[in-house]
Design a protein with these regions (language model features):
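Positively charged n-region of N-terminal signal peptides that target proteins for export
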Residues: 1-4
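C-terminal motif of bacterial Sec signal peptides marking the signal peptidase cleavage site
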Residues: 14-16
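Non-catalytic cap/lid and distal C-terminal segments of serine-dependent acyl enzymes
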Residues: 21-323
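Sec-dependent N-terminal signal peptides
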Residues: 6-9
Length: 323
C-alpha cells in the first residue's frame, strides 16, 4: 500500500484537538495508505491510532471517486460495515456492496452529486453491541435485554455479552471522524450534503444516527433494517424502536429517511415490522415519496449481493444532483 499524506489539513485537525501536538504526531496519525482491490476510484486507509480511545482500535477507510481532484467539493456518505463495501476478495462471505463501481457510475452519468464514502469498520464480535441503538435498548426490561444480548454473543462465539455502545460509536463518528474528514478532504460539511447508510444492524444505526444527530446527518439510508434486534421473534424490541421513531424521527427534526427490505432469508422477518414503522412515520406527518421512502424488493435476500443490486436507488434518493 502506498502512503498518501494530507499534511496541512492533518496539522489543522490535530492542532484543533490538542495544542501540544507535534509534527511527528501529525505524520503518525494522518498517513493514509492506498488500498488495492477497488474497481473504481481510490481507497485510502488510516491506521487505528485515529480512534483516540473513543471505541476499540480499528482502521478507517475513505473512498474517493474518479472525480475527486482535491479542488471541487464533494458530498459525504458515512457507511457502516466498512469491511464489506469494496472488495469481495477480502470479505468473510466473498460478497461486496460494489459501492465504488455504483457510486462512480452514478456520478459519471450526473445522476448524483460527486460523493466520497467514509467506510466505518465494525468491531468484529462487538458489532451488534456497537450497532444496537442505545436509548431504545435502555427502555427494555433488564431480564429480557440481558437474555437477548447473551443470545447474540453466543451466536457470534462469545461467552460474555458486551455492553451496548452505540452512543460511543456515534460520538466517534461525529466528534472524531467527521471533523477529520471535513479538515482533510474537499467536502461539504453541511447536513444537506451528509448522509449515513447501512444494512441490517447498520440500518438500525443509520436511523439512530439521524435521530440523535439531525443537525449533522441530513439523510439516513436504512436497508434491510433489523427491527427484531436479536435473532428470535419478539415484540418488545420492535416496540421500543417504534417508540423512539415516534419521538425522534419527525419532519420537524430530521431531513430525509429511506427504508427498504427484501422477502428472502432474514429479510423475510421484516415486512410486518416495517409496515408498523411506516404507520408511525405517517402519524408523525411524513408523506410517502417525499422526504420518506419505503420500498419492498421481492426475491431479495439479506446479503451484500442483494443490497448491491438496489444500492443505486437509495444513493439517488440521498444525493440526486441539485447543487
Amino acid at each position: 500500500m502506498k502512503p498518501y499524506f494530507f499534511a496541512l489539513f492533518a496539522a489543522l485537525f490535530l492542532l484543533s484537538c490538542n495544542s501540544t501536538s507535534t509534527q511527528s504526531d501529525v505524520t503518525a496519525v494522518l498517513q493514509w495508505d492506498t488500498v488495492s482491490g477497488v474497481s473504481a476510484g481510490t481507497l485510502l486507509r488510516l491506521d487505528s491510532s485515529h480512534t483516540k480511545g473513543t471505541i476499540s482500535a480499528r482502521p478507517l477507510d475513505v473512498w474517493l471517486p474518479s472525480t475527486y481532484d482535491g479542488k471541487r467539493k464533494h458530498a459525504v456518505l458515512y457507511m457502516y460495515d466498512g469491511q464489506m463495501l469494496f472488495d469481495a476478495n477480502s470479505t468473510w462471505n466473498h460478497q461486496e456492496w460494489r459501492v465504488d463501481e455504483i457510486m462512480d457510475s452514478l456520478i459519471a452519468i450526473k445522476t448524483t452529486l460527486p460523493t466520497i464514502i467514509v467506510a466505518l469498520h465494525h468491531g468484529g464480535v462487538m458489532r451488534n453491541f456497537e450497532y444496537f441503538p442505545q436509548k431504545p435498548f435502555q427502555t427494555l426490561r433488564a431480564q429480557f435485554s440481558d437474555s437477548t444480548m447473551a443470545a447474540i454473543a453466543s451466536r457470534y462465539g462469545s461467552d460474555t455479552a458486551f455492553p451496548v455502545k452505540s452512543d460511543a460509536y456515534l460520538h466517534y463518528m461525529v466528534d472524531v471522524v467527521k471533523p477529520l474528514v471535513d479538515a482533510t478532504f474537499q467536502v461539504y460539511s453541511d447536513k444537506s450534503a451528509t448522509a449515513v447508510a447501512g444494512s441490517s444492524m447498520g440500518g438500525l444505526m443509520s436511523m439512530y444516527a439521524i435521530g440523535e444527530y439531525p443537525e449533522v446527518f441530513g439523510t439516513a439510508l436504512c436497508m434491510s433494517t433489523h427491527w427484531p434486534g436479536g435473532f428470535s421473534p419478539n415484540e418488545e424490541i420492535p416496540n421500543a424502536f417504534q417508540k423512539y421513531l415516534s419521538e425522534n424521527i419527525t419532519p420537524d427534526r430530521v431531513g430525509k429517511i429511506y427504508f427498504d427490505y427484501g422477502t428472502e432469508t432474514l429479510d423475510a422477518m421484516y415486512e410486518p415490522f416495517q409496515n408498523q414503522v411506516n404507520s408511525v412515520l405517517e402519524a408523525n406527518g411524513f408523506i410517502s415519496g417525499e422526504r420518506w421512502v419505503t420500498q419492498k424488493f421481492p426475491g431479495a435476500a439479506h446479503d451484500e449481493k442483494s443490497w448491491a443490486k438496489r444500492l443505486h436507488i437509495p444513493l439517488t434518493f440521498a444525493f440526486a444532483k441539485q447543487r
